[in-house]
Amino acid sequence: MGRILLARHGNTFGPGDTPVWVGAKEDLPLVESGEAQARALGEALQAAGITPARLICGPLKRTRRAAEIVAGLTGFAGQTEIDPRLTEIDYGSWGGKSNDEIVAEFGQEALDCWDKRHTRPDGVDWSPSDAELKANALAAMADAASSRGLALVITSNGILRYMHAALSGDDGNAKVKTGNLCAAELGGTTGSRLFWNEKPDADLIARHFG
């Protein structure tokens, strides 16, 4: 069995911005508050006395920058690994649209399907396929859990929802807020959630990984 930390990158919209759906093709950088969220994660790890043995992230700017900030604060001296399986979902014609625009074009039920029930709406032009996303989520976690030492995985909300679905435990809410942290324990092809969607906290991290 191996334990891993999973984190969502920080904010990509500032206070005056209208949030839109940001997928694989919307490669936005972290805004100032998003960088602060990455620093909060790095500082929590530092306070818990933990330096990751591996730091793994998706190829998009927002996850790579978050990993860079965490590496600098924790004294991580290795090479950050870029795993394409951690790339956010390509939301197709939903990408770049606000929730109001999506409801107007596709209907409230389609939005609720993903936002409230955490299932992919019927007929959407998202990619990869549902099956591929599920397989990638479990494989990426299993690979990270095979590390000698703690692996920290930084990815995006859509991928974290598929990771949540691949793990056992209290179902709860699969959504992970920007900058928040999750933990899982993997063994073979199965795994369980240790905690989900928590603000980075040194005591919480030390309790599970100290």
Identify the function of each model-found stretch.
Residues R39-Q46, K134-A145, H164:
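Generic structural signal for well-ordered alpha-helical scaffold segments
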Residues M1-R3, I89-V103, R161-G210:
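Acidic, low-complexity terminal tails and accessory targeting/binding regions
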Residues G2-R3, A7-G78:
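Active-site-proximal alpha-helix that buttresses catalytic centers in soluble enzyme cores
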Residues G10, N157-G158:
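Active-site metal-binding loops of divalent metal-dependent hydrolases
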Residues L28-P29, L73-N136, F195-W196, I205-G210:
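Phosphate-handling substructures
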Residues R62, I159-L160:
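Alpha-helix capping/helix-boundary segments
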Residues C57-G58, A135, I154-T155:
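Short beta-strand scaffold positions
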Residues I4, A53, S147-T155:
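Generic beta-sheet signal
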